[in-house]
Each structure stands twice: as structure tokens, then as C-alpha cells.
């Protein structure tokens, strides 16, 4: 019994920010109203229109002609309503690419049921659901509109959303793509920096789908598996940072510390050779080059849980440490997230920018807006796909290389799946 309890405790620590039990004062609900209201409205709209069917509805887009090229936008997703939280957590805990737990098939339902009420409260605080599907749809619409102009030979283009843990699931999106009779399919990760636990998991889902149904794809697959230094992505981040710096008092602006915050990883994953830390660092370096190193900065990591070593320093500890050293003007920049979700809207905006900032005596703390509906970001996505099509490459050179100490045999099968495609 003691062993089982220890295993459950380890499982509870394994899911990052989604499993945390923050005590948040209700008196600090609104800190950045210009952002809160827009996100709350988006989430409310999602709540009203969410479908509660067993499977996902086809992703409806206006099409005059049969689509020729499909772009599958891959991400983990987020629950649209409070009622979706349990199933979201259940799928997350069952994902062996993300975490490996003892007796996972039994532990996952237990943990999901136990944690649902607390996670529902976090989503209630950000408007009742995640806006990530809204933003992904908006980005996809802008992307395919530009692509039809940039690449008429591969048009019409259609975007599909493939989430790992909520509808529309990756597998459901693939089924729709197959029904649409596409000539070409591009698996486009929405994580700029590659990690085996994020992009790797989504690509593994594509391989597993075809392996389980026992048939080959009718369309030609390729993948955009990372894009940490794309010039328009860097420009978007730089623009949003400059915009937010303008909100600091003029006399304090030059001393604002820019904290680039990314989701942390356990050092056990990093030490296997996961490229995520290096790719996040590359993004930060390019952004600061674009900004001509206008302010002091650091790369910090959020969402660590449990006693095991993770990438550091942690975002919350960094805020505390800076304040103790008299640096009390801070700009948080979510550098590994392109759309708002629980880790920006709750962890950064509430836990850190409201509660922690009050405790530490921060003078001014702000968070750079996520890329969300920025038209330049849709242009970046279109440019990435257009360049990928023109390159005639199946994937990046990096994807062909397994982590030196990889322990997941499915990764090798997935790499073989994509590198064996014929364009």
C-alpha cells in the first residue's frame, strides 16, 4: 500500500502546471483588464458553441474547390468548457510519450478524476475554458488565405486542427483529411521549439494512427517539425516586447528585466538529448539581437513540480530573486507559447503577475501579449509552409536524429514513417 501511495504521489507530480494547487486570492482577479476581458470573451464564445458529441464534427471551412493540400496544425489543445477538463486530463495522463507511470491504465483515470475539480477552478478563473482552439482557427484561416496566393500550384489549401488531448483529436483530423482526398498533407507543429514530449508526441500519434488502422496513407506526408528562429516569428516576439515596454514608466523603462519564460523539462529528459533547451535559447538569442539588446534579460523556466531536478532557474524563483536584489520592474515573455492558454493566462497572469508580485513587492510587472491573432504571425505560418513546399524536403535534418539516449522505440518508427514518404 505504501508503494502504491508513493507511485500515485509521483504520478501527481508528473503533470506540470495542470496538477498544481495554487491558493489564489480572489481579490486579485483582474490585473491586466485589457487582456483579461478579450480572453474571457473568447473563452465565453467557445463555451457557448462547444459541441458535446462523442466525436468531433468535421472542421468546416468555406471551400469553392476540393482541397489539394492539407496543413495539420498540431498542438496539445485545451478544454473548451469546464465539462471537458476530465477527459483532457485523462488523455494527458494516458500519453506515454509525455510521461511513463506505473500501472498507467489504472492510475490515469484515478488521477484525472481526483484532479478535475481543482483544474476546473483554474479554467473558471480564466473565463471557463481554453481559447487555444479559437486562436488556432484564426491563425489557420489567415495562413491558408495567404498560401492560396503564394502557392497557387498547391492550392486550394485547407487547415486542420489536430490536438492531442481534446477534440478535434489528431486521429480525427487525419480521418477527415483522408476523406477529403488530399494530394499532400503537412504535419505542422505549433510548437516553435521541438521537444519529444510535445511535437514528438503529436508526430507519434500520426504514425500510430496508420499503424493501428493497418493501411498506408492515401496522401503524401511531410512535416514542419521545428522553427525556432524563423525571421517573422522573431519579429512578432520583438514587436510584442517593444509594445509592452512602452507601458512601463519612462524613467524605469531601460532597467526593466525581460524574463523569457518557457515550460521546463525534467533533467532526466534533457540528459537523454532532447533538443528543446537549445532551441528555446536560440529563439531568445535571435529576439534579443532584433531588439539590439535594449534591456537586461534572462531565460527562465516555469511549471516545475516535484523534488526531481528540472531545467532552471524557475520563473517564480527568478522573480523573487530579482526583487530581493532591487530589480522590481519585470516583463514576462512566454517564448515557447504562441497562443494563450492555461500557462499564460493562469500561471503567468495570475500566479506570478498578481499573487507573487504582491508578495515580493514588485513595482511593475507585465506580460508580453501572446501572438494569438497578430496578422504578422499568420504571415509567418504561411511563409513557413510555402518555404517547406518549395524545399521538397520531408522533414528537418534534426528529426532524422534520435536523442542519443532515447528510450522510446516509437520515436524511431515515427522518424522512419516520415523519411520514407515519397513527394
From Swiss-Prot:
Transit peptide, from-to: 1-54
CC cofactor note: Binds 1 [2Fe-2S] cluster.
Modified residues (N6-acetyllysine): 57, 415
Enzymatic reactions: heme b + 2 H(+) = protoporphyrin IX + Fe(2+)
Active-site annotation: 230, 383
GO cellular component: mitochondrial inner membrane; mitochondrion
GO biological process: heme biosynthetic process
Primary location: mitochondrion
Modification type N6-succinyllysine: residues: 138, 415
Membrane protein topology class: Peripheral membrane protein
Localization in the cell: Mitochondrion inner membrane
Entry binding sites for protoporphyrin IX: 115, 123, 130
Alphabetized HAMAP family for the sequence: Ferrochelatase (MF_00323)
Listed name of the protein: Ferrochelatase, mitochondrial
